[in-house]
């Protein structure tokens, strides 16, 4: 940590320590799982994803993987995460034989390393946490086949005070106290609060995707308390 603040390079280890409580925490977040399922539907795959290969980049304990399975039950799905503790939780859950998990940093691996190239890459709550944010979209594009689709689902606070005020209130009123109660350590949840404030606005992230070579970039905000705070981005690899 630097000055008491969790660094992005330390995030996988922090998730290892908090893996046991993670599912309980996100499960208490109204709309968390529904939001992931709604984001996954942006792939718009026909026939349950038959014949397609999907990568769940930053799969964590498998919540985003489950959203992909619900949307594309016939697709081949690979989940990758840098946290061994989170992956252990994911692997312990029941999955179809078409789902497998890999431990590693997604930006350090090639499409061939992961069994790609992929028809779609799902990056849910990932880009904020990668050490090399500027290089990350291009790294994800390299994992896609031509015409493949990237779906990003993440905190990207809309410019202006309203979204930030809601985010401050939710984090300091709910998320950080709950994290401290369940784990005895609120460091990861203070990092979550700060990382969203420091991350791109929706417009900036859309621009980052375009600069990485993606086309057809579209943005959609979540509903409820997450309106203007959580956004889904859909982009295509040329």
Language model features with spans:
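Conserved class I S-adenosyl-L-methionine
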Residues: 1-47, 63-67, 193
């Amino acid at each position: 940590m630097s000055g008491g603040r969790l660094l992005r390079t330390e995030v996988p280890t922090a998730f290892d320590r908090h893996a046991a409580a993670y599912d309980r925490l996100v499960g208490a977040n109204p709309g968390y799982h529904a939001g992931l399922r709604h984001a996954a539907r942006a792939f718009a795959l026909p026939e349950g994803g038959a014949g397609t290969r999907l990568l769940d980049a930053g799969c964590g304990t498998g919540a985003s993987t489950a959203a992909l399975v619900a949307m594309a039950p016939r697709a081949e799905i690979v989940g990758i995460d840098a946290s061994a503790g989170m992956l252990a939780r994911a692997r312990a859950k029941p999955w179809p034989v078409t789902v497998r998990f890999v431990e590693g940093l997604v930006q350090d691996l090639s499409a061939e390393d992961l069994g790609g190239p992929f028809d779609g890459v799902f990056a849910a709550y990932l880009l904020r946490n990668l050490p090399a944010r500027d290089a990350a979209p291009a790294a994800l594009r390299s994992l896609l086949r031509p015409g493949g689709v990237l779906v990003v689902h993440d905190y990207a606070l809309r410019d202006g005070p309203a979204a930030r005020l809601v985010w401050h209130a939710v984090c300091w009123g709910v998320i950080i106290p709950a994290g401290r109660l369940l784990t005895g350590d609120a460091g990861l949840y203070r990092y979550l609060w700060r990382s969203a404030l420091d991350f791109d606005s929706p417009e900036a992230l859309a621009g980052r995707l375009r600069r990485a070579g993606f086309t057809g970039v579209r943005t959609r905000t979540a509903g409820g308390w997450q309106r203007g705070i959580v956004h889904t981005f859909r982009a295509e690899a040329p």
